[in-house]
Amino acid sequence: MLRTTILATTLAVTFASAEAATPLQVKVYNADGNSFNVNSTLVYGEKEAMVIDAGFTRADALRIAANVLDSGKQLKTILVSQADPDYYFGVEALSANAPRTPVLPKALNGNSLTVDGQVVELRGNQGLLAHRPYFWIPSIKAIVGNIGVFGNLHVWTADTQTVAERSAWIAQLDEMAALQPKIVVPGHMKSGTAVDISAITYTKAYLLSFEKNAAATKTSAELIDAMKKAYPDAPPGLSLDIGAKVNKGEMKW
């Protein structure tokens, strides 16, 4: 786990929609480095709420549950967007605070859900990275629940070990940017990161830099050093260390 002194924070952003009588609101819980800086998003309207991703620890889940209680809305769904532990380990503690709330996926039927009648669309579930989808909320032009967007951190590359996979990742980022989102909630982010399109730009630039430096270096140590120099403000940790070792063939993942 990443060890930092960053405190878990909650960010609240509200965007109006011309089409919706009551625009959806988005509240982001940003865990600290002990939970890999993973995000959980509460989406709520006039009456209903949905939690996208349940946090990594019990403490994370309880803080997310507090956000739900503070909203005063009925929690309709707990949606787990990714198959990584930091997205679902908190489900049990979170659902214990909302025992009537269904948890998805058991399996998500179709490609959309709703919050107070406003659509939350599943996207990016085709092609090489079909197992890494994201969710698009058109009424507020928001992208949430995606493992492929990072904010001011070293990007996790251990799960994309080929040039083809990383190229598909960049293509997905371009697809997201083409939606011209007003809100972008990274899967993981450094405290204080803006939840907007700049996170997509950051992640794409990082991947291109990683590709260039991977080709120019012989060992993981050299690659790690190059990426630290390219991103001096990104906290050090397992993401870069493991990603470099895996992509240099020094470690199996």
Predicted regions and their residues:
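Metallo-beta-lactamase
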Residues: 56-57, 96-201, 205-209
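Active-site metal-binding motif and surrounding structural segment of the metallo-beta-lactamase
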Residues: 59-97
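Gram-negative bacterial Sec-dependent N-terminal signal peptides
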Residues: 1-19
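Soluble non-cytosolic domains of exported or imported proteins
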Residues: 37, 55-62, 85, 107, ...
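Conserved beta-strand hairpin/beta-sheet module of binuclear metal-dependent hydrolase folds
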Residues: 21-75, 134-137, 141-147
